[in-house]
């Protein structure tokens, strides 16, 4: 469960805290992050020593499901929500959410968004393109995995069943 102010890299030339610092001594094999979460994004991040699995989970053709909880600087209008679902044009092409909804009936500045794209900073760019500022971004689901039971900065080993599901592609 990646905390804020942690860089998703194996080695940072600026000597900032990295996700590798969180798992120091976890195993003898060389492990590395699967995909990226920017420094201020929190949540589910997978680390592995299996290059084939990492490739399968990050390659665009496999379209792995990611769900984020987004806290915005202001209420998201229904019209903007519908536009995100229908698709918006960004500098690097069109993107649409597979699902988007308010996480609370009252607070319209908290949103859940499901996407399959792995483009860099895609969730932030979606909302920024419509004039919103993302105040907090938390990935709550990635390729069948959640952060349930883990506090920020904590990690756990995957179960044998989870590893098998990931290897077989038995996840969204």
What are these regions (language model features)?
Residues 2-172:
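Basic, flexible Lys/Arg- and Gly-enriched helix-loop patches that mediate nucleic-acid binding at interfaces
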């Amino acid at each position: 469960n990646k905390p804020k102010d942690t860089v998703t890299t194996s080695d940072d030339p600026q000597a900032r805290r990295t996700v590798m610092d969180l798992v120091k001594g976890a195993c003898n094999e060389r492990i590395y992050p699967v995909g990226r979460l920017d420094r201020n994004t929190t949540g589910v991040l997978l680390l592995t020593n299996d290059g084939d699995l990492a490739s399968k989970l990050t390659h665009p053709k496999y379209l792995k499901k990611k769900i984020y909880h987004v806290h915005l600087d202001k209420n998201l209008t229904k019209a903007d929500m519908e536009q995100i679902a229908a698709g918006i044009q960004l500098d690097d092409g069109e993107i649409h959410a597979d699902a988007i909804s308010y996480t609370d009936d009252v607070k319209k500045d908290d949103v859940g968004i499901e996407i399959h794209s792995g483009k860099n900073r895609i969730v932030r760019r979606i909302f920024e393109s419509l004039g919103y500022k993302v105040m907090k971004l938390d990935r709550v689901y990635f390729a069948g995995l959640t952060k349930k039971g883990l506090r920020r900065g904590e990690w756990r080993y995957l179960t044998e069943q989870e590893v098998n599901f990931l290897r077989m592609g038995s996840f969204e």
